[in-house]
């Protein structure tokens, strides 16, 4: 009938008719009861200018339940460089859970329980950082999906666990070349978490 989580980026917002189609799909999914996930994933080369990008990327925020941005996108989405302030602003605009990725430092999560830092994992070597943010968010959404909770039911402890899982996925992803081939399997992620817990 409808997906549990409906995920969208901003690339389909760059031009018509894709922009209107994206809004139609998001509104339809939300009306059907789907959780809306959004990763703006700003790519300057795909927009005519930054002002246009800001306008259209921000236009989707009011429909979103779960949102992931990088620390390089905070100012673009909120006019604030500080990750804590940016996350709080997005939450106040209606986003239930905001995750700001911080590269190797981990992620900052903001929700109804306030904000918390979730540190990253140590990596053996960095081969390729492409896909690190996507792999983090994929891992995070996997945990949201399997929790069977609505976004506003998630506790800070839940979110710390989900972000830790996402950080583990990302740490494995950057150790291999190629964003897609580098995506780890569940057993690898669980092993990475177990190793870090005992080290």
Question: Which ranges hold each PLM region?
Answer:
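Generic, low-specificity signal for short hydrophobic/alpha-helical stretches with a mild N-terminal bias
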Residues: 4-11, 39-42, 72, 122, ...
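Conserved beta-alpha-beta core of the PfkB/ribokinase-like small-molecule kinase fold
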Residues: 5-8, 13-89, 95-96, 105-106
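Conserved phosphate-binding/catalytic region of the ribokinase-like
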Residues: 27-28, 79-199
């Amino acid at each position: 009938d409808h997906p549990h989580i409906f995920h969208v980026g901003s690339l389909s917002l760059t031009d018509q008719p894709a922009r209107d189609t994206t809004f139609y799909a998001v509104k339809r999914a939300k009306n059907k009861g789907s959780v809306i996930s959004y990763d703006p994933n700003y790519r300057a080369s795909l927009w005519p200018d930054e002002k246009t990008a800001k306008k259209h990327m921000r236009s989707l925020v009011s429909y979103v339940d779960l949102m992931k941005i990088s620390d390089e996108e905070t100012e673009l989405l909120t006019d604030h460089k500080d990750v804590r302030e940016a996350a709080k602003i997005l939450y106040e605009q209606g986003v239930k859970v905001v995750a700001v990725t911080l590269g190797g430092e981990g992620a900052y999560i903001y929700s109804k329980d306030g904000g918390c830092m979730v540190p990253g994992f140590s990596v053996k070597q960095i081969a390729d950082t492409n896909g690190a943010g996507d792999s983090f968010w994929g891992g995070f959404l996997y945990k949201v999906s399997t929790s069977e909770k609505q976004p506003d039911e998630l506790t800070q402890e839940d979110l710390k666990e989900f972000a830790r899982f996402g950080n583990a996925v990302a740490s494995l992803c950057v150790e291999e070349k190629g964003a897609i081939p580098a995506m780890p399997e569940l057993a690898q992620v669980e092993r990475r978490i177990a190793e870090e817990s005992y080290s």
